[in-house]
């Protein structure tokens, strides 16, 4: 799926991606591909949607689009 990072907290290591379908997906910095732990809001990304904690869907395998 494609989307855009709409929020990210360096301090907490968590953020949100708004998918192309308009759904907001939570993510933890460990889900960013390539070993980096930070990503800027506004970055266009590709990601997978996986079942997460508390029954919500979350973003995984997050890769910035070039």
Regions found by a protein language model. Name each.
Residues 1-10:
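Structural detector for short beta-strands of small beta-barrel domains
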Residues 50-66:
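OB-fold/S1-family single-stranded nucleic acid-binding modules
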Residues 23-36:
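Beta-strand/loop nucleic-acid-binding surfaces
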Residues 9, 33, 63-66:
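A generic structural motif
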Residues 6, 18, 48-50, 60:
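Conserved positions in beta-strands of structured domains
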Residues 33-46:
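Short nucleic-acid-contacting surface segments enriched for D/E, G, S/T with interspersed K/R
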Residues 11-17:
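Short aromatic-glycine-enriched beta-strand elements
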């Amino acid at each position: 799926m494609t989307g855009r990072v709409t929020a990210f907290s360096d301090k907490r290591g968590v953020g949100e991606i708004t998918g192309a379908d308009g759904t907001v997906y939570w993510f933890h910095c460990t889900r960013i591909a390539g070993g980096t732990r930070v990503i800027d809001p506004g970055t266009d990304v590709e990601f997978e949607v996986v079942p997460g904690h508390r029954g919500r869907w979350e973003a995984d395998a997050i890769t910035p689009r070039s």
